[in-house]
Each structure stands twice: as structure tokens, then as C-alpha cells.
Amino acid sequence: MANLFDQLKEFTTIVADTGDVEAIKSVKPYDATTNPSLLLKASTLPQYAPLIDEAIAYAKSQSGDKAQQIEDAADKLAVLIGQEILKHIPGKISTEVDARLSFDTDAMVQKGRKLIKLYADAGISKDRVLIKLASTWEGIKAGEILEKEGINCNLTLLFSFAQARACAEAGVFLISPFVGRILDWYKAKTGENYTSETDPGVLSVRKIYAYYKEHGYKTVVMGASFRNTGEITALAGCDRLTVSPNLLERAEGYRRYLPRVLVDNGATKQRPALLTEKEFRFDQNEDAMATEKLAEGIRGFVVDQNKLEKALAEKL
């Protein structure tokens, strides 16, 4: 019998959640995603030293201002790592916008355009890149603007139904609801152990998937942040799942039959009126888990962005 990975590929697109090219070569995913934490980790790998040198040289050629050089080097490095990954996958790479911009729509739009231009300068068309944005109200609005310019977006750090609904209504290409981090929060709060069928993260993605399909939204649902293979099997049939290399490797040993769980039965319901900003903010605030995990996620990415920039600054 085929392993979990091979069975899952029959009805779900598998995406590698890593910046490590060697891991990508090994698991052969369709797409790949990166974020500041993964880029920081990747930047310590010896095979990336030439890319760091190239990013530094690029930054020095663009500006004499140290702060601008640091920003340019970080952006260039993200794109260089993305370029390297694209050599080994047939699909798209997700490259994240600086999390410090998460509450500034205009700044996120400008950064998204800049990243796409850096890819274009390297001969990579925008249809192979997803710009990752935090699913704040401002991030969702930035995604809406970029999508209208033909720049596809991946709205990440998504923990609530309000975020998912606003993303669909904005017409973004893809969302990344975080399964494992939702589970983490509930386990910490309740002290309970959850099965894959009672896992709050799994149930959240199932609800979002069903809502999108029955209302005819085209936004792709890509489950993310998995803690175990049970969460993955419980979401078999989801549009896409982005999985870390270690979980993908574990899936190699799974030899049981994998049934499809999520099924698209077509649009059957009329779409509601668009969610207003006031409604979004209230609904998000009512969800303590989503409020805490979104804030925590942004802070975590900012910490790693700062660490990456500090390491780059030492080389400038």
C-alpha cells in the first residue's frame, strides 16, 4: 500500500514548509512556503553562505545608507532563497512581507511590489510567487490591492473564522489557517488531550473549507502548522496542506488506507453581505485564542526578522 504522502497527493496538493533546499529535494513537494523564522534557520546553513554574500553585495550597490542596506539585504536574501527553492519545485514559493508592517496596508503593498520586482529582475514571473501577509485587517486589505494588480497573496497567521471570511471576500489567492497553534492554545487553556476528530485546529479548517466551498469562494485553503500526522489525515482533501519536512518524513512510514475527509460539493448557498471593518475587529476580539495567537505570531516573526537583520548588519 502507498504511504500517507503518496495517498494524500491524490486529492491534496502538498507544500513543503521549509527554507532548506536539501529537504525540498528529498520530499519533492509541489509548492513551498517560507517565513522569517525559516529564513533565519536557513541562513545558518553553509550552502546558503554564497546567497548571503550576494544579498550583501546587492544591498551595498543600492544605497549608502546602512539602515536601507539592511532592509535591502533581507529582502534580497528572501528572494534568493526563494529562487533556489523554485529550481526544485514545479509550483509556487511563498515569500513573506516583513511582519513589522502588519498594521500598515500601504507599506505591505509597497513591500509586496518590491519583492515581486526582485523576482522579476531574476527572471521569475509573478505567477510563481505568493506574497505572504499577516491576516490583520490591514494585511487583508493589502492582499486585496495586490490581487487586483495580478500579484497573488498567501494570508498567513490565520486563526479565526472572521479572518477567513474577510480573506475570501477580499478575493485573496490563498489562506494559511494554523492548525497546530490553535491546538496548542486549547491544550494550554484546558489541559485536555484532543484526538484528531476533536482537535480545535482541525475543526476550524474543516469549518472554513466547508464555508468557502458552499458559498463558491475561489480562495485556496491551505492548512498549516501541524503538530502530528493525525491532524494531516483528518484534513485529507483540503485544497493544500503545508507540512514540515520532519512530518513529511514520518508520513513515509504510514501504510494504512487514507480516506478523503474534505469534499467540495459545490456552491449551494448565497454569499452574505461583506464583513465591515468594525464587524471584523469585534469578531476577532471576541475570539481570545485568535487574538492572542495572531499577536504572538507577529511578535515571533518580528523577533526572527530582527535576528536575521542583525546577522546581515554584521556583514555590511
Curated annotation (Swiss-Prot):
Taxonomic lineage from the root: Bacteria, Pseudomonadati, Pseudomonadota, Gammaproteobacteria, Methylococcales
Active site: 132
GO BP annotation list: carbohydrate metabolic process; pentose-phosphate shunt
Top class in the EC scheme: transferase
PROSITE patterns: TRANSALDOLASE_1, TRANSALDOLASE_2
Keyword set, alphabetical order: Cytoplasm, Pentose shunt, Schiff base, Transferase
Functional note: Transaldolase is important for the balance of metabolites in the pentose-phosphate pathway.
Gene (name only): tal
Reaction(s) this enzyme catalyzes, per UniProt: D-sedoheptulose 7-phosphate + D-glyceraldehyde 3-phosphate = D-erythrose 4-phosphate + beta-D-fructose 6-phosphate
EC numbers on record: 2.2.1.2
Protein name: Transaldolase
Keyword presence, Transferase: yes
Source superkingdom: Bacteria
Sequence similarity: Belongs to the transaldolase family. Type 1 subfamily.
GO cellular component assignments: cytosol
Cross-referenced PANTHER family: TRANSALDOLASE (PTHR10683:SF18)
Pathway connected to this protein: Carbohydrate degradation; pentose phosphate pathway; D-glyceraldehyde 3-phosphate and beta-D-fructose 6-phosphate from D-ribose 5-phosphate and D-xylulose 5-phosphate (non-oxidative stage): step 2/3
Compartments reported by the entry: Cytoplasm
GO molecular function, one term: transaldolase activity
